[in-house]
């Protein structure tokens, strides 16, 4: 039963598929199927889009090629302009060099053409010259052929630029003879060759004269440095200070005999340092510090210093104007110190009035006439001033004390 059932199922499915296909074909024949029309249109559209993209790519490539072509054309034009400029510059340089005897280089093609043209008439002449002047050719190198210009290249000189005054004359041994010999040599015509040689003159030899340029050696000078002057114990300062007070040689010899205990020093220094210390080494005085009205006893004679009561100046009044009668020396003798070993007396103080001493005012006796005339213009009642009397310092001090007492009483 099973195989029959499966066979019937397959037949049924085949019949259904045949019915569907027949119905679809029928619709296609009748024009009712739309899928057959859309498919070719889609293909055509795809083809058009591909062609358009290809056209765009081709246009881009053409634009690039056109730009490259334009750049090439511009470059060619620029190179042509530069070539013209360079040709003009080369012509100017060639003309400038030709002024100094330089000949332009001949191209190889032109040389070969000239050789082919001029070979026939020159060969006969060259054979004759070769037979007669074989020895001369062996001794001297061949001269330049006719294809090269006769003018030899010449280096520019200062005279070409108008600088003749800067030319340095150089004297050479017999230079004109070499020039004359060069001019008198016969010109030998040789067959043209590719590498034509030019006879170059040798530079004349000049013997150097060193008589005027000999190096003079400096003379040796003695600076007074010896084993006696190289002493390091003395720096020569005292000797230089006392150089003006040198004595005669005899007196120096006598003093050197007396002073045998002096240490060994150089001879020029011994002559100046053997003198006594009291003559040249005077020590400075002791600084004195004075106060007005205070008497300080001296160390030698134990005598009190007397304070002077000189009136101070009108403009400058200071304590430094006091003068000291006795001054103590820096060096003290032992004998005098032992004798004056007694206690010094106490300092005596002067009167209290002298401590507060003030300068006396100037005595105005009379106003100058020119000042009085000026003052009288502004004040007609101005009378001549009366002379002012000087007041002693004691009275002035008493008046000042009375004024202070009056003020204190008023405050009380």
UniProtKB/Swiss-Prot annotation:
Phosphoserine modified-residue sites: 34, 119, 139, 152, 155, 159, 267, 318
InterPro entries reported in the protein's UniProt record: SKA3
Protein name per the record: Spindle and kinetochore-associated protein 3
Taxonomic source organism: Homo sapiens (Human)
PANTHER family in the cross-refs: SPINDLE AND KINETOCHORE-ASSOCIATED PROTEIN 3
Sections of the chain in a coiled coil: none
One cellular component (GO) term of this entry: meiotic spindle
Source organism, top-level taxon: Eukaryota
Gene assigned in the entry: SKA3
């Amino acid at each position: 039963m099973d195989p029959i059932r499966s066979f019937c199922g397959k037949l049924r499915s085949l019949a259904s598929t045949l019915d569907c296909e027949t119905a679809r074909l029928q619709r296609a024949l009748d024009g009712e199927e739309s899928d057959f029309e859309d498919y070719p249109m889609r293909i055509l559209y795809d083809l058009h889009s591909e062609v358009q993209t290809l056209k765009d790519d081709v246009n881009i490539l053409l634009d690039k090629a056109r730009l490259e072509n334009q750049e090439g054309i511009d470059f060619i034009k620029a190179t042509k302009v530069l070539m013209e400029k360079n040709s003009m510059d080369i012509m100017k340089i060639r003309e400038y060099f030709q002024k100094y005897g330089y000949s332009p280089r001949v191209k190889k093609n032109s040389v070969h053409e000239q050789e082919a043209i001029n070979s026939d008439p020159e060969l006969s002449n060259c054979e004759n010259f070769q037979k007669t002047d074989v020895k001369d050719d062996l001794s001297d190198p061949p001269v330049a052929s006719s294809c090269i210009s006769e003018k030899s290249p010449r280096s520019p000189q200062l005279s070409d630029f108008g600088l003749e005054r800067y030319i340095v004359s150089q004297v050479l041994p017999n230079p004109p003879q070499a020039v004359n010999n060069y001019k008198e040599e016969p010109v030998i015509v040789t067959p043209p060759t590719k590498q034509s040689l030019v006879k170059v003159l040798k530079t004349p030899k000049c013997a150097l004269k060193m008589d005027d340029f000999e190096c003079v050696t400096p003379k040796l000078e003695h600076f007074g440095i010896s084993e006696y002057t190289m002493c390091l114990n003395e720096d020569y300062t005292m000797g230089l200070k006392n150089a003006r007070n040198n004595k005669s040689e005899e007196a120096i010899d006598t003093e050197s005999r007396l002073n045998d205990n002096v240490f060994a020093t150089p001879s020029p220094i011994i002559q100046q340092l053997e003198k006594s210390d009291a003559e040249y080494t005077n020590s400075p005085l002791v600084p004195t510090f004075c106060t007005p009205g205070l008497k300080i006893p001296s160390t030698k004679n134990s005598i009190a210093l007397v304070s002077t009561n000189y009136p101070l100046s009108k403009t400058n009044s200071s304590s430094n104007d006091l003068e000291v009668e006795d001054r103590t020396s820096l060096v003290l003798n032992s004998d005098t110190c032992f004798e004056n070993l007694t206690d010094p007396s106490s300092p005596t103080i002067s009167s209290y009035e002298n401590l507060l001493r003030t300068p006396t005012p100037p005595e105005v006796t009379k106003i100058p006439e020119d000042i009085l005339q000026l003052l009288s213009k502004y004040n007609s009642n101005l009378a001549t001033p009366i002379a002012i009397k000087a007041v002693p310092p004691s009275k002035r001090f008493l008046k000042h004390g009375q004024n202070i007492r009056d003020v204190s009483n008023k405050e009380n």
